[in-house]
Amino acid sequence: MKIVIDLMGADHGVLPIIEGVSRALENKSFSAVLVGDKDKATPFISKELASKVEMIHTQDYIKMEEAATEAIKRKESSIYLGMDILKNGADALISAGHSGATMGLATLRLGRIKGVERPAICTLMPSVGKRPSVLLDAGANTDCKPEYLIDFALMGYEYAKSVLHYDIPKVGLLSNGEEDIKGNMLVKETHKMLKAYDFFYGNVEGSDIFKGVVDVVVCDGFMGNVVLKTTEGVASAIGSIFKDEIKSSFKSKMGALMLKNAFGILKQKTDYAEYGGAPLLGVNKSVIISHGKSNARAIECAIYQAISAVESQVCLRITQAFESLKPSVSVHQSDQQDA
């Protein structure tokens, strides 16, 4: 299995990415292709690691402040070169660089799976249960039609079933209330269409994401990104409050010591690094979009995530789902119109 790793554009430079690749290679068998500035990377690559990876040199990359559309023009940029390697035989790509550039190039260079109108970013959210919830779209599509959300539901269902091994995933539609009549026009129209599918649970509220009420939560990219950023902010704020209170007295420090294991589990469940990255679903190869602030652990987990996606053949599963399941939407709509 060959995995392409974009070294450029992350907030903390190349070091955490190289460390993450090194750790993953200690635990999994795969071929790593590093794309980026060789001069910046070489000081951090040991002789042992150098023997296990292939290095493709380029100094160009799409900066965060640049428009995503720059990517298609910059054929020597790290993400363009990486996407070409993926298109021409590699199995997966991971990038912690410009997410818009990654999404745009993946769509243009790899192509969409037949039947998919818009690819979506799929992210894992912590829940009170033993397994996380899947949220999509987490930011790829700000403005959506109901048909796009149907695509997201199908892709999220297949990802949960194939990659996460959830037996019969339940899919919920994010709304401002669980009643069928709640929601804006987009939610109401999507709800009607999703009723055609056995996996559809119904509307869910924001709090249900973390209760594990459903396995997959579907929404437009604007709402999904707000949910994601709010979750990150709340988790960070709670962590800071805990630290301040623990340091406030000797009694608090002793109590924290007794709860060390519980705090460790809480941190693991709420730490974005443990989830790796966010798969871009709907394109013809596995692409993982990692957080710009990714540390070595996040890159390591993103690689494991990519390996799971490839081994589970999730792109093929989504293709098959669109061939067999999506036509039922048009049938359902026709039935409604006839009625």
Curated annotation (Swiss-Prot):
PANTHER family: FATTY ACID/PHOSPHOLIPID SYNTHESIS PROTEIN PLSX (PTHR30100), PHOSPHATE ACYLTRANSFERASE (PTHR30100:SF1)
Coiled coil (UniProt feature): none
UniProt EC number: 2.3.1.274
Pathway(s) of this molecule: Lipid metabolism; phospholipid metabolism
GO cellular component, one term: cytoplasm
GO BP annotations, alphabetical order: fatty acid biosynthetic process; phospholipid biosynthetic process
Protein name per its UniProtKB record: Phosphate acyltransferase
Acetylation recorded as keyword: no
Superkingdom in the source lineage: Bacteria
Localization terms from the record: Cytoplasm
InterPro entries for the chain: FA_synthesis (IPR003664), Phospholipid_synth_PlsX-like (IPR012281)
Catalytic activity: a fatty acyl-[ACP] + phosphate = an acyl phosphate + holo-[ACP]
The keyword Ligase is annotated on this UniProt entry: no
Pfam families named among the record's database cross-references: FA_synthesis
SUPFAM superfamilies assigned to the protein according to its UniProt record, in alphabetical order: Isocitrate/Isopropylmalate dehydrogenase-like
Subunit structure: Homodimer. Probably interacts with PlsY.
